[in-house]
Amino acid sequence: MVIKFLSALILLLVTTAVQAERIRDLTSVQGVRQNSLIGYGLVVGLDGTGDQTTQTPFTTQTLNNMLSQLGITVPTGTNMQLKNVAAVMVTASLPPFGRQGQTIDVVVSSMGNAKSLRGGTLLMTPLKGVDSQVYALAQGNILVGGAGASAGGSSVQVNQLNGGRITNGAVIERELPSQFGVGNTLNLQLNDEDFSMAQQIADTINRVRGYGSATALDARTIQVRVPSGNSSQVRFLADIQNMQVNVTPQDAKVVINSRTGSVVMNREVTLDSCAVAQGNLSVTVNRQANVSQPDTPFGGGQTVVTPQTQIDLRQSGGSLQSVRSSASLNNVVRALNALGATPMDLMSILQSMQSAGCLRAKLEII
């Protein structure tokens, strides 16, 4: 009875230690991807927050071209003072296997000096691909997430007002040709290159589908032999993508955003014992203007302005602190927090730790 209990306990510990994920969560099918679309159009119906046409002549030119296509002729030399129109760029993504008549979301962004696109309506805008072919037509009311108000020279703004979205705002008019179903092989691409994971996925497919069904070509690509025909390949991929593989531990990595000062690390990061001293150097420059005037008004003196500059240099910190060896993410966080460093200081500390061989991780600065 005791032996059975211990066996069950060991099996439970092993199953909880190993993390299994589906192949579909780790890979994508090569060639099955989105395609970017772009277009140029006009937004109308703005509440006086559109482009200043004297500074954005392309807005007036676009409006004249559109009116002429509708049979309306604007006299030459007419100075149209428009406030409710804005020139915009429209972007969208054409999904894989997108069919004619299907709707997609679009993003609308101001091109000129419009103050806000809130309440505007995008007029019919053709969306083109890199081959200059029209694949979709966009039109509809824009939803802007920000808000703002101004009066008496003061203004308040929350979030961005010069961009918005139109949900299901474009209709697909042309389908992209697809090579899916052509040939007897397909390539699965790993989201992150990993030789061991690529080989493990190939071995898993071979165990279920037979030896030679899958081959790992490199650290990112697994070539799979599939039956011919669209329906047969769909069924084959559906079975393969639901197979589960044991995920190997990730590479230890620390990602630093130099613009925002944020530091992110995964659970594989470890620290070796080291000593850290971090000092802050601040320089303050204060400049004042001293005015010197003569005591006697009729003595022929002259008022003189002399600048006075004061420079203050302060250096704080610098005491040597010990950092213990840490093998788990929680201990790493505690060890770094014990230094009392700001995120900006932490970036320099982590770089120095890696140079000294104390940080067991890849350091990536974005």
Curated annotation (Swiss-Prot):
- Keyword field: Bacterial flagellum, Periplasm, Signal
InterPro entries (UniProt xref): Flag_FlgI (IPR001782)
Example GO biological process = bacterial-type flagellum-dependent cell motility
Major subcellular location class: periplasm
- GO terms for MF: structural molecule activity
GO CC field: bacterial-type flagellum basal body, distal rod, P ring; outer membrane-bounded periplasmic space
What family is reported?
Answer: Belongs to the FlgI family.
Which function does this protein serve?
A: Assembles around the rod to form the L-ring and probably protects the motor/basal body from shearing forces during rotation.
What protein is this chain from? Flagellar P-ring protein
Q: Could you tell me the gene encoding this protein?
A: flgI
